[in-house]
A protein has these predicted regions:
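Short acidic/polar alpha-helix capping motifs at helix-coil junctions
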Residues: 1-2, 72-73, 85-89
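Active-site rim elements
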Residues: 3-11, 91-98
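Short, contiguous alpha-helical
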Residues: 10-14, 18-21, 33-82, 125-164
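Hydrophobic alpha-helical core bundles mediating ligand binding, dimerization, or RNAP-core interactions
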Residues: 13, 17-20, 24, 101, ...
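Surface-exposed helix-capping loop/turn segments at secondary-structure junctions
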Residues: 26-35, 110-122, 157-164
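Low-complexity, compositionally biased segments
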Residues: 28, 62, 91-93, 160
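Acidic/histidine-rich alpha-helical segments that form the ligand environment
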Residues: 84-125, 136-144
Length: 164
């Protein structure tokens, strides 16, 4: 019996999401979650909400326009949270972040269900300039969440240290 690379990668995504949601739960348990979500570790640095929303919006972009050429959900949020965006001071609530993470993951899983391991070498039109295959992109998405969850986690710890 062989297990597909797509299934293995989805399992890694699940573990990463558990860690991301644990960080979000820790924030939600604090006395003023919105204040925590808007806290920045330094001038011009990304706040916690941006780190978490960026995870979801990136997955939404890959699930739609980057893999299959469709329009992403959250068209109003994409410019605010896609890679290269500048974090603004309009801080989303915990429930909004949780919904974006859940829905974008569902969209990504739905898109991935249309692929087989034999499709992993395909380079979608939207990723040609980066020469990024579906297989490489799904591995990068696993790294991407862990990277930004780690940034959110250390930012939360810095917030706690600064506000004891």
């Amino acid at each position: 019996m062989s297990i597909s690379l797509i299934d293995v990668t989805c399992g890694v995504w699940d573990l990463n999401r558990e860690k991301t949601l644990a960080t979000l739960d820790a924030i939600a348990a604090l006395p003023n979650p919105l204040r925590v979500l808007g806290w920045r570790p330094g001038p011009g640095r990304a706040h916690l909400a941006w780190q978490l929303m960026h995870i979801g919006i990136t997955e939404e972009l890959f699930a739609t326009e980057r893999f299959v050429g469709t329009v992403p959900a959250y068209r109003d949020l994409v410019p605010r949270y896609k890679g290269g965006s500048t974090p603004d001071d309009d801080i989303p609530a915990v429930d909004v972040i949780r919904d974006v993470l859940a829905n974008s993951r569902e969209h990504l899983r739905t898109t991935m269900s249309t692929f087989a391991d034999s499709d992993l070498e395909i380079i979608p039109a939207a990723l040609k300039e980066r020469a990024l295959s579906i297989g490489k992109a799904i591995k990068l998405l696993a790294w991407h969440e862990a990277h930004h969850q780690g940034q959110a986690h250390i930012t939360l710890n810095l917030y706690k240290a600064a506000h004891q």
